[in-house]
Regions:
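Iron-associated oxidoreductase/ferritin-like identity signal
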Residues: 1-97
Length: 97
């Protein structure tokens, strides 16, 4: 799995590839944190703690959005796909018959 590290010898990977790996792994971690906080918010019975957990979850969403934007700016194909699918009213699976 990507979160376990590199799949190819690191000395054969360019600096941009290593940076992209860092960003992708970080994005995965942020999304995992959102999932964990969602579960904690659902399971929590203390309203004060629930509010803190929801706040923390939303900060993780901000981090994920920042990483996704960095990836978009660095990867032309991601840029193309995100511009096609995000913030659109088109069917999500458009273009796939």
């Amino acid at each position: 799995m990507a979160h376990e590290g590199y799949h190819e010898p690191i000395d054969q990977l360019s600096a941009p590839t290593r940076d992209m790996h860092r960003a992708i792994v970080s994005l995965m971690e942020e999304l995992e944190a959102v999932d964990w906080y969602n579960q904690r918010v659902d399971a929590c019975h203390d309203s004060g703690l629930k509010e803190i957990l929801a706040h923390n979850r939303d900060e993780e969403k901000e981090h994920a959005a920042m990483l996704l934007e960095w990836i978009r700016r660095k990867d032309p194909k991601f840029d193309e796909e995100l511009k096609d699918y995000l913030f659109s009213d088109k069917p999500i699976a458009h273009g796939h018959d």
